[in-house]
Structure formats: C-alpha cells, structure tokens
Amino acid sequence: MRKVIHIGLPKLSEEELIEIGDIAQRVIIDYIFEHLAKSEVRDMEVTARINQGETLDLELEVYVEVPIFVRVDVESLIDEAIDKAYEVVERHLRKLAKGKGNEGREEAEEASGKSK
C-alpha cells in the first residue's frame, strides 16, 4: 500500500478520474511490454479503482501470466510497473493541482514512452 500524499488537489471531474485510470493502466502495460515480448505474455489484466472522497484513492491490480519457460520474476516486474504508474500519476496530479492538466498528460505519455 502506498502512502498518502497531500498535494492540494481540487475535486476532479469524472472525465479526469477516468483519464487518471487510463494513464496508470497505459504506463503499466507499456512497462510490462518493455520487459517482455508480447508473445511471452499469455494473459494480462490491469485494473484501476479510483475513489474520490476527502482523499483520492487509486488502487492498481495487475495480473500477468507467462509460460513456464519464460525466466522472469513476474511479481517483481508487476511491482516495478505499479510503482512507475504511481509515480507518473502523482506527477500528473501535481500538475492538475497547479492548474496544468494538459502538461501532466503529456508528461505521463512521455514517461510511458508514448507520444501523440
């Protein structure tokens, strides 16, 4: 479980919450496929749950199945991907708190290796 970080975030719209989940999922998927070939992944599921109350709670769950002959520590890879996603989302939220939502999305795309 990640720690609570207070950044003075305003109430977010439903679209912004969906975007945060999308950013987190994209970062995780990109990170996994930076380390594994698509042919090495039998199944993958990435779930983002967001709850906005007094705080914004983001819960990420990742499941990756690889064939037995693929020599990779899947749990470590998943942990690293989730950490990366939280870092990118935190930077994006800090930009939103400062009123720079578009720059935060661009930074998230750059950090995940994607660009428009």
Swiss-Prot record:
Provide the residue span(s) of the region labelled Disordered. 97-116
Q: Which InterPro entries does the record associate with it?
A: DUF3194, MTH677-like_sf
Could you tell me which Pfam families the record lists for this protein?
A: DUF3194
Q: Where is the composition biased (Basic and acidic residues)?
A: 100-116
| UniProt similarity note | Belongs to the UPF0440 family.
The entry's protein name is Uncharacterized protein PH0533
**Species lineage:** Archaea, Methanobacteriati, Methanobacteriota, Thermococci, Thermococcales
